[in-house]
Every structure is written in structure tokens, then in C-alpha cells.
């Protein structure tokens, strides 16, 4: 693809820096744990409480 090399160079220069990688490793466990807790909480509300997902998060 024509822009593939440009995107790869941009990622290597701007996104995949040493500091960003350190931040990702440092906070990954925190973010993944929070997502898991949220998912389990919704699952418990659905199974035990008999609630539907649409009742938990109103779309309108």
C-alpha cells in the first residue's frame, strides 16, 4: 500500500516511544482489572437481579 511506510514511520516515531511503552505496561493491569470488574458487575446484575442490559444503560 502507498501509505504503509508513512504510517509505520509515524508509529515508530510518535506512538511507539519508550515512554509510551512504559506507561502501557505500568497501567495495563489497572485498566484490564477495571474492565473486568465492570463486566462482572453487569453480569451479576443481569443474572441475579433479573435486569436486562437495556434497563441498566438507557439508550434514549
Swiss-Prot record:
Please give the GO cellular component terms listed in this UniProt entry: membrane
Annotated membrane-spanning segments are 27-49
What's its membrane topology?
Answer: Single-pass membrane protein
What keywords were assigned to this record?
Membrane, Transmembrane, Transmembrane helix
Location in the cell = Membrane
Per its record, how is this protein called by name? Uncharacterized protein AF_1161
